[in-house]
Every structure is written in structure tokens, then in C-alpha cells.
Amino acid sequence: KLSIGIPVYNGEKFIQKCLNSILNQTFTNFEIILSDNASTDLTTSICQEYANKDERILFIKQKSTGTRASNYNFVLEQSKSEYFMWASADDIWHPEFIEKNLMFLETHPDFVGSTSEVELFTGIWNENDTSKFKNIQPKKKYEWVHPLIGTFEEKVKFLFNFRKFEYMYAIFRTNHLKKYIIKEFMTWEVPLILNVLKYGNLNVEHGVMMFKYMGGKTSPDHYKKLFTTTKNYWGYSTLASLFPFVPLTFHVFNVVGPKIFLKHLLKRFIMDNYRAERLVLLDIFSK
């Protein structure tokens, strides 16, 4: 029924909590496609141990470290299920996350995906502390995700006004998700979500049922050194790192089309590229 793709690289600190969170779901008819991107820490042995214990886990260790996008594409390509979700190796889910979102999708064929409200955390998650699950009401309704409903143009306009893109880890209908091939560039999840929205709406279940870790290399503070980030983390060439938002601009233009882009997004992307160039220059001259 559902494939859960977990791309992981050097995730020894979090992968056990992630897998426990998924294996403790009230819905159990799923497979886990666990792809280790040639980790150099204990990730491989941890993943193999879990795969040996649970036949629902398909564990693959890549021979060499590929790009983040290639690992995300890989786990999606392995899926033969009707529904698919990516699971970040450092995130946590409420036990009813899958059940409630699948129930919605089963009864609403015009929706291409469903997720829940999201709460961000930056510390180490204590598995024995279940207090976060006892009160799953958000601090602010739709703080990080918001239902995306309407025409494609309306959804695009709202999404860029909302300016938050925590939809990547929703449960999607696999056939629509596979219509877009992920390319490796900063914020590649934006055109991915836009492309999926061509085929229907995206639901957000009430209450926080996903807890997303924000203390990694792609945290907001890390983007203050934009030139360094794009070179060292994303693998951009020196020239590409000078213009880090150009790939995103190009891919969004291709997905939404010239009419919607010129009408709703042109000014925004001009400003975003301008701000990016300022950050790049500040990073370069602060060295």
C-alpha cells in the first residue's frame, strides 16, 4: 500500500529514533526502502540490524556517495506501491501520522498528497518523553504547512506568499510524484512540490503529527555563508556558487510556465536573486 523511502548518510545519531517512530505507526501495511549513501559512521550497521529484524525493511548500501538528490530519486524509483512518502533520517512522527493521512487520501481522490502540521525541533529527541504526543495541537495553526487547494495558479501564488515549503515529507500518490525527476540544486524541493500540485490539491491534517529536525547543515544559520554552503555542501562549481538561486529560478519557470511566472513570481525571484548575491558577496569578502 505504502512505500517509505529513507535516504540516509552518516545518520548514526538519529536513524534509530527515525526507524522506531515509523515502526511504531498504527498503520502497518508498508515497506521501508532504506538507502545508505555510503556512510562512513555506524549508519550501515544500524540499518542492517533493523533490516534483519523486520522483513518490511529493504536495505541498500550504495557503493559510493552520490548526491542527495540521487539518493532521494533512488528510493522513489524502487517503489511499486500506490502511495509513497520520503522520511528524513532525523525526523519523528506521531504514531497515527500514516493512518490518518492515508485515510484522507483514500476518500479524497482529487488530492495528490496529505501531511500534518509540523513542529520544528533542534535538540536531541528523547524517545522516552511522550509528552509531545499527548498534546498535538500546534502553537500556531498551519505555522509551517498550509492546505494547498484551488487552481494550479492559485496554489502557486499562495505557496510563494506563504514562503514555507515543509511539504516534502507528505504522503503522495506515487504515480504523480514520479512525473518529476529531482535535480541536484539548492531548494530542489520547491519545483518538486509545484509539479505535484499540477495534478491535484494537498491536504494538511489538523494537529502536529510530524516533528522536523532543524539543526543540520541546511539550517537557516548555515545559509548566512551562502557561497561556502553551495560549494561545500551542494557541490556547486565556483561559478555556479556566485549565482546560487539561478537553478531554482530556471526550474520553477519550467514547472509553472511563463504566464504564471511572469504574472506572480518574476518580481519575487528578481529580489531573491538580488538578496542571494548580497549574501554571496558578504561571504566572500568576510573570509
Language-model features and meaning:
Residues 96-138:
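Conserved donor NDP-sugar-binding/catalytic core segment of glycosyltransferases
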Residues 36-45, 64-65, 88:
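A conserved acidic beta->alpha catalytic loop
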Residues 1-2, 23-34, 42, 55-58:
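Short loop->beta transition adjacent to catalytic acidic/histidine clusters or analogous donor-positioning motifs
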Residues 62-79:
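Glycine-rich, basic loop-to-helix element that forms the pyrophosphate-binding segment
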Residues 16, 41-49, 96:
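Acidic helix N-cap motif at the loop->helix transition within catalytic regions
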